[in-house]
UniProtKB/Swiss-Prot annotation:
The gene is nodA. Keywords: Acyltransferase, Cytoplasm, Nodulation, Plasmid, Transferase. GO terms for cellular component: cytosol. PROSITE patterns: NODA. Belongs to the NodA family. It holds the Pfam family NodA. N-acyltransferase required for nodulation. Acts in the production of a small, heat-stable compound (nod) that stimulates mitosis in various plant protoplasts. The N-acyl substituent is a C16 unsaturated or an omega-1 hydroxylated fatty acid in R.meliloti. NCBIfam families: nodulat_NodA, PRK00756.1. Its EC number is 2.3.1.-. GO terms for molecular function: acyltransferase activity. The keyword Transferase applies. It comes from the Bacteria. It is an enzyme of class 2 (transferase). This is Nodulation protein A.
Length: 196
């Protein structure tokens, strides 16, 4: 079955309050099945969980929002190397559309990534998403790094908790302006901010 979607590529400040409300509901429904904790940041019309994206790719179909991906340019540190990247995050597909191939449509972001002038895009996903991500990487458009820890700031400061968190997610890298073999070596990525 072919899925027809219309992509909207926009800067964050182009979104109106109604857009944030619609995205908030979309994220609660998309992330809620993985646990209430994952849906909580999107209460009250908020359409971001940690860092706010700079650009968004939003796919719409006849029902409403079908898919979403956020993009944020930032410097990360990979091992000893400071690296400008486009972080990809806030990825979601409406639950009724999962396994319909919409993930491959994220290629709609490619021109935007080139416009941003970054050598690589990178994102992190839970290990439970490995099969999904591996299918996407089979065509050589991306590569999965394992055994790499990622340290991020915590978006909400709490006096009783540390201000950073180190995790062991799957790291996915996408070549944009440079080939994959130029990704610097290192077993720790310093995100230098909150997760997107």
């Amino acid at each position: 079955m072919s899925l027809k979607v219309q992509w909207k590529l926009c800067w964050e400040n182009q979104l109106e309050r109604a857009d944030h409300q619609e995205l908030s509901e979309f994220f609660r429904k998309s992330y809620g099945p993985t646990g209430a904790f994952h849906a909580k940041p999107f209460e009250g019309g908020r359409s971001w969980a940690g860092a706010r994206p700079e650009r968004r790719a939003i796919a719409y179909d006849s029902v409403g929002i079908a898919s979403h991906m956020g993009v944020l340019r930032r410097f990360i540190k990979v091992g000893e190397t400071d690296l400008l990247v486009a972080e990809l995050g806030l990825y979601a597909v409406r639950p009724d559309l999962e396994r319909m191939g919409i993930a491959h449509s994220v290629g709609a972001l490619t021109p935007t990534l080139r416009e941003l002038g970054v050598p690589f895009a990178f994102g992190t996903v839970r290990h439970a998403m490995r099969n999904h991500v591996e299918r996407y990487c089979q065509n050589g458009m991306a590569s999965i790094l394992t055994g790499v820890r990622v340290r991020s700031s915590i978006a909400e400061v709490n006096a009783d908790l540390p201000s950073t968190r180190t995790e062991d997610p799957l790291v996915v890298i996408f070549p944009v302006g440079r080939p994959l073999n130029e990704w610097p070596p290192g077993t720790l990525i310093e995100r230098n901010g909150s997760e997107l």
